[in-house]
């Protein structure tokens, strides 16, 4: 009987722990990255925000802010274009490999909301559900797709945004970057402050699937949550030399 009671207690304790963990896509705090796109700043970028309640919030990027409101059970669209504030030149990451200071988009709301992110131009379109900061992890594997060999602007890519200052990140890319600054399968470290984005793009025909990204502890500070996005600037699907294709754009799950 004692053994049976002990097993029941362990099961109940585990259930309570699982119930206490909130993995919902609803939240009050989000980090968005717009990774590189074959059309650069010409690309149109939009955020779609909804909630079952009325909500008020602020979008911040690159020192600019954009207040917004959400009516319950309706969708609010925030467009980041060259004619709005902030402009998409503040938000899109065009660095081949390197750090974009304050390129992370921070969304804060007074009420739980759901956020979707979209980047497009002409017939090319990519979108992702955005995970709230409370469910972000510290360790990720990248999924991507081969870029187009014959196009200099077609690259496999991933990007990392820090949610806190002094975030130390270790990265082991599955392929070298387009500038050959970071060899394949060799771990390197970067340090990011809150809102900074590190983007990594492959050479043509590259595929960064399998790249490993981990937030690590520093002296006197624990490892910190990060958001990771991946995809391609442009890919042809099923036919490597096709004349049409799409960018791929997805936030990674921890």
Residue ranges and their predicted role:
Residues 1-24:
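Bacterial Sec-dependent N-terminal signal peptides
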Residues 21-254:
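Extracellular lectin-like interaction modules
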């Amino acid at each position: 009987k004692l053994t049976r009671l002990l097993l029941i207690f362990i099961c109940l304790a585990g259930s309570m722990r699982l119930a206490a963990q909130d993995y919902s896509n609803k939240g009050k705090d989000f980090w968005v990255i717009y990774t590189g796109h074959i059309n650069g700043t010409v690309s149109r970028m939009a955020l779609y925000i909804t909630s079952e309640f009325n909500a008020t919030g602020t979008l911040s990027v690159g020192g600019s802010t954009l207040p917004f409101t959400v009516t319950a059970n309706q969708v609010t669209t925030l467009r980041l274009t060259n004619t709005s504030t902030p402009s998409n030149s503040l938000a899109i990451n065009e660095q081949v490999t390197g750090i974009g200071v304050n390129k992370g988009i921070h969304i804060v709301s007074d009420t739980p909301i759901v956020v979707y992110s979209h980047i497009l131009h002409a017939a090319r379109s990519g979108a992702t559900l955005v995970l709230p900061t409370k469910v972000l992890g510290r360790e990720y594997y990248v999924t991507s797709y081969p870029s187009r060999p014959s196009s200099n602007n077609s690259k496999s890519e991933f990007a990392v945004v820090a949610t806190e200052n002094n975030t130390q990140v270790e990265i082991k890319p599955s392929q070298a970057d387009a500038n050959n600054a970071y060899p394949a399968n060799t771990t390197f470290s970067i340090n990011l402050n809150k809102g900074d984005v590190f983007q990594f793009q492959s050479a043509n025909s590259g595929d960064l699937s399998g790249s490993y990204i981990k937030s690590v502890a520093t002296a006197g500070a624990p490892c910190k949550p990060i958001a990771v996005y991946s995809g391609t600037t442009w890919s042809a699907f099923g036919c490597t030399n096709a004349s049409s294709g799409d960018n791929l754009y997805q936030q990674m799950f921890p």
